[in-house]
Amino acid sequence: MDSTNLCNALRMEFEGIFENKIPLDAFPAKIQDMILALSRQENYSIEYMMASLLVAVSTAIGNAVNIRIRGGWISNPALYMILVGRPGMGKTPPLDFAFRPIRKHDAKIIKQFKLDMEHYNSLVENNKAKKDKSSSLPDKPILRRTIISDFTPEALMRALDDNQRGVVVYVDEIMGMFNAVNQYSKGQLIEQLLTAFSGKPLDISRCSIPVPIHIEHPFINIVGTMQTTRMHELIEKGYKDNGLIDRIIFVYPSSQEISDWGLDEESSVSTFGKYSSMWDSIINKVISLPFIENEDGRAIHNVLEFSSEAKAYFTNWRNNAVRAVNQIQDDGLVDSRVIKAPTITARLALVLQILRWACGEEHKDFVDIDSTKSAIALSEYFENCYTNIQKYMLRESVEPQKRELLDCLSATFTTADAIQAGKEVGLSERSVMYSLVSLATNKVIKKVKRGEYEKLQ
């Protein structure tokens, strides 16, 4: 272990990262160092920061590099991600930091586009003034921006058509986007997002679009923030039933405490500048990966394979998860997210391999065993986040008096324990029995055997 890794390990031990099972060691050493430094200095949440960097790298890669998951199954590294937490948790600052280099890249492109349009419009006007109008005009400039924040579904599809390397839907309070989707597009955008995630072609025909849009290999990332109390709205909109939620990575820190501010150190500005510059260089290196299109405008993908060792490890991990699902007899107890996990995990492995290359720590010839193991660790961490969100939503859905009853009970309890606790909170024996049936039906508790129960949250 070199000095940087040793230093990072000691800092992670001090911060309680290992204790909270946060897989910060899945990242390259210089990224670990950056996350730890900015967490202490800027109060960035380590967990939000980890996730923000991943989706930023994924965005920078776009359709430039794909991964072969199995046989003919090839995938881009697209990720749908939502940072969840109470107000004041600091969800936005790490996201802004992670995407700052891509915003700078977009700003340069927009500036050049404006100049190109001025030149093009000037040529058009000059051509109008000529008697001989046979002189040809150059192609009209196209704006190939990456970050899309304020948009209609049609505008998003146009932006994706113009920039087939890929775009990211970046919305701070993301429930606003979902509400607008339901109000204006009758759910069409959600269907397009489901299609894009699966890597299937998008075809859009509208009266307002003179030439129909066909996108053979759509790449759309989604990233945003959401308050914990609004999570239930995603369920109510039917996004669990249609599978959208199964495709979203939710990031929910192990601690929901808002950190104190420390006093600024004299070197804080220069330290922030140092890491900001380093991150700029890393993202710009990823953006420099060539995205090649043939004469028909179709992408020629650079496809990375798993190494033989990585493929065996990944396949074994996936098979173990599926075997566990196959043991479940009740279809209602099957977690549909398990089926999507291999796709998301393979994409994370690709993102990590490219990030390690951009940091100067590894190659980009194939996805190795280290990137694969790290991706699995991250995937399992993110699923734990989702489980904790589910527990929160279950708890919030319980009526206040039943919640009081639960608070008086241990993790495992008997009917007699519940009746005694009911007396303490003013519930009759009959009310307690009805409450136990209701809580078990809603999967807040589980009946282990006659007269014995276990809390599921």
Regions found by a protein language model. Give the residues of each.
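Phosphate-handling catalytic cores of nucleic-acid transaction enzymes
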Residues: M1-Q457
